[in-house]
From Swiss-Prot:
Subcellular location: Cytoplasmic vesicle, Secretory vesicle, Acrosome
Sequence repeat spans: 66-70, 71-75, 85-89, 91-95, 110-114, 115-119, 120-124, 125-129, 130-134, 135-139, 145-149, 150-154, 155-159, 160-164, 165-169, 170-174, 175-179, 180-184, 190-194
Region (9 X 5 AA repeats of [SV]-G-E-Q-[PSA]): 110-194
Keywords from the UniProt entry: Cytoplasmic vesicle, Glycoprotein, Repeat, Signal
Annotated organism of origin: Papio hamadryas
Record GO cellular component, one term: acrosomal vesicle
Protein name in UniProt: Acrosomal protein SP-10
N-terminal signal peptide: 1-21
Region (Disordered): 64-200
Length: 285
C-alpha cells in the first residue's frame, strides 16, 4: 500500500512536470530519480510499523504538496515557464524541502525576477530613448550640414555671379586697350603726315617743267606725244632709250617717280633709263 502511494505521488509529480517542456522533463526526471532513491532508502531502512505510518504520512504530505505545487505550477506556467532558477527552486521543493520555504523562495524568486527585469527593461527603454535621441540628433546635424551646404551653395552662386562682373572689367579693359590701339593707329598716320610734309616741301622747291615725248627718233626729234609735265613731290624728269640690235630705235621722256638710272636687257632689247635732275630736257645726243 505504501509503495502504491509512493508510485502515485511520483506519477502525479511526473505528469505535472511533463507540461513544462523537454528541458523541464530532463531536470524533473533527475529530481524524481533522486527523490525515489531517497524515499526507497528511507522505506527499506524502516522496520517498525510506527516508522511505516510516519512514512505513509510523509508520502501523503508529499502527495498533497505535489498536488499543491502542480496547481501552483499550472497557474504560473505563463509567468515562470522560461525562468530556469524558479523551476529549479520548485524541483528542490518537490525533492523533499518544506513546501512553505520552497513556495516562499519560488515567490521570492519570481517576485524578484520581474522587479529585476523591470529596471533592466527600463534601462533598455532608456537606452532606446537615448538611441532615438541620438538618432534624432543625427538628422538634425545632417540637416544643419545640409543647410550649411545649401548655405554655401548660394555663396558659390554668388561667386559665380561675381565672376561675370569680374570678367566685365576685363572686357572693358580689352575694349579700352582696343580703343587705345585705335587711338595709336589714328595717331600714327598723323605722325606720318608731318614726315611727308618736309618731302613735299623739299620737292615743291624744285618744281620743273619736264619735256615729254611719246616717240623720239635717234636725232632727238619728237615724232609723237610732244608736251610738258610738272614734277611733283618726288618726281623727276626721266628719259628712256630703247636699243634693238645695238641700234637706237626710239626714246621716251616724261615725269616719273623715284627715277633710277639703270640698264635693262630683255631678249636682245636693251632699255637705258636716264634721270635728269633739275633739267627739263634729258636728251643729249
Amino acid at each position: 500500500m505504501n509503495m502504491f502511494l509512493l508510485l502515485m505521488s511520483l506519477y502525479l509529480l511526473g505528469s505535472a512536470r511533463g507540461t513544462s517542456g523537454q528541458s523541464d522533463e530532463s531536470s524533473g526526471s533527475i529530481d524524481h530519480q533522486t527523490s525515489v532513491q531517497q524515499l526507497s532508502g528511507e522505506f527499506f531502512s524502516l522496520e517498525n510499523p510506527s516508522d511505516a505510518e510516519a512514512l505513509y504520512e510523509t508520502a501523503s504530505g508529499l502527495n498533497t504538496l505535489s498536488e499543491h505545487g502542480s496547481s501552483e505550477h499550472g497557474s504560473r506556467e505563463h509567468t515562470v515557464a522560461e525562468h530556469t532558477p524558479g523551476e529549479h527552486a520548485e524541483s528542490e521543493h518537490a525533492s523533499g524541502e518544506p513546501a512553505a520555504t520552497g513556495h516562499a523562495e519560488g515567490e521570492h524568486t519570481v517576485g524578484e525576477q520581474p522587479s529585476g527585469e523591470q529596471p533592466s527593461g527600463e534601462h533598455l527603454s532608456g537606452e532606446q530613448s537615448l538611441g532615438e535621441h541620438a538618432s534624432g540628433e543625427q538628422p538634425s546635424d545632417e540637416q544643419l550640414s545640409g543647410e550649411h551646404a545649401s548655405g554655401e551653395q548660394p555663396s558659390g552662386e554668388h561667386a559665380s555671379g561675381e565672376q561675370p562682373s569680374g570678367e566685365q572689367p576685363s572686357g572693358e579693359h580689352a575694349s579700352g586697350e582696343q580703343s587705345l590701339g585705335e587711338h595709336a593707329l589714328s595717331e600714327k598716320p598723323s605722325g606720318e603726315q608731318p614726315s611727308g610734309a618736309p618731302i613735299s616741301s623739299i620737292s615743291t622747291g624744285t618744281i620743273l617743267n619736264c619735256y615729254t615725248c611719246a616717240y623720239m627718233n635717234d636725232q632727238g626729234r619728237c615724232l609723237r606725244g610732244e608736251g610738258t609735265c610738272i614734277t611733283q613731290n618726288s618726281q623727276q624728269c626721266m628719259l628712256k632709250k630703247i636699243f634693238e640690235g645695238g641700234k637706237l630705235q626710239f626714246m621716251v621722256q616724261g615725269c616719273e617717280n623715284m627715277c633710277p638710272s639703270m640698264n635693262l636687257f630683255s631678249h636682245g632689247t636693251r632699255m637705258q633709263i636716264i634721270c635728269c635732275r633739275n633739267q627739263s630736257f634729258c636728251n643729249k645726243i
